[in-house]
Every structure is written in structure tokens, then in C-alpha cells.
Amino acid sequence: MPKLSIVVAPDERLTTRASEVTGINDKIKELVNDMFETMYNAEGLGLAAVQIGVLKRIFVMDIQLEDIKGEPVGYESTGKFCMINPEITELSDEQVILKEGCLSIPEQSHEIRRPKYLTVKYKDLNNKEQTLKASGWLARCIQHELDHLNGILYIRHLSKLKYDMAMKKAEKFKRHYER
């Protein structure tokens, strides 16, 4: 299957809340496979369906970074996942600031403050309800991709001035590459 095109900001699809997936069928499974292929081809860690123009509550991710020492027992910090209709049920009070990037905002990265740990409920490709306790980059990626499903770009977590500068840079990038 050919890789899918990634939607680049500014684009109204990236600021639109995605709708719930009502059933998992072969079409959804094929979409998920194409999303993984697209994510790997773009060398990303995660990809939300809205980033390929599909306004459904699905994202994929593959975090194979080194485990962070000192993470609490029972929390995952690596793994390959497809999350359908995800919902964060618990966020830690403890927060951490790390640099993030995004396939939909190329050639930029910004320091973003996010909760360090979380619990998320979601459906897998077998339509089974799953619960995951996540930490480290896995927790960060879940929050980043879930923001996409809610129509929020990660740069929205910046100050207004930094957000405006990031959007101007994104607009310039998009104009340059659309020629």
C-alpha cells in the first residue's frame, strides 16, 4: 500500500475534533496498517488519523526508546500500540518539560510541559477494551496524539508569542514546499 500524505499545518483538519470510531472492520484495520507504514516512512514516533486527513479517533505509535530509570513499577514506557477511541482516565500531578516535534509541523521542536504519568483506556484492533499505565516518552506520545484527536496542536501549549512564531514558521514552510 502506498504511504499516505501527512497533513501539514496550517490546515483546519488539524484543529477539528475527530469523531468516535463506531466499529472496527477491515477498512479500519487497513487504515491502521497504512498509518504505521506512513509513520515509519516519516520516521515518526506516533501518528494520529487526523494527520492523514481522516477525522477518526485513532492513533498509532511505536516508542522503542530506552526505559527511563526510576519509573514506577507497573507503568509502561515503551511499546507499539494502536489506540482507538482513547480516553485518559488519570494524569499525574508531577509534570516534566521535554522537547517535542510533530510530523504535521515539520522542522520545529519546542519544550512542552506535560504530566509525567497517565492511565489511558482504549480499544485495540480486536475491539477489546484495554487499560494502560504509561510513563516517559510513551505517556508524552499518548498525550500528544490525543491532543491531535481533540483538534489541538502541541504548539498550543506554548505562550501566545511562541505559538504565533511557530505558526508563522509553519506557514512559511508550507508555502515553500507547496510551490
Curated annotation (Swiss-Prot):
The keyword Iron applies. The active site is at E145. Keywords: Hydrolase, Iron, Metal-binding, Protein biosynthesis. Its cofactor is Fe(2+). Its EC number is 3.5.1.88. It comes from the Bacteria. One of its GO terms (molecular function) is peptide deformylase activity. SUPFAM superfamilies: Peptide deformylase (SSF56420). Pfam families: Pep_deformylase. Fe cation binds at C102, H144, H148. One of its GO terms (biological process) is translation. Binds 1 Fe(2+) ion. The keyword Protein biosynthesis applies. It catalyses: N-terminal N-formyl-L-methionyl-[peptide] + H2O = N-terminal L-methionyl-[peptide] + formate. Removes the formyl group from the N-terminal Met of newly synthesized proteins. Requires at least a dipeptide for an efficient rate of reaction. N-terminal L-methionine is a prerequisite for activity but the enzyme has broad specificity at other positions. Belongs to the polypeptide deformylase family. This is Peptide deformylase. It comes from Wolbachia sp. subsp. Brugia malayi (strain TRS). The lineage of its organism: Bacteria, Pseudomonadati, Pseudomonadota, Alphaproteobacteria, Rickettsiales. The gene is def.
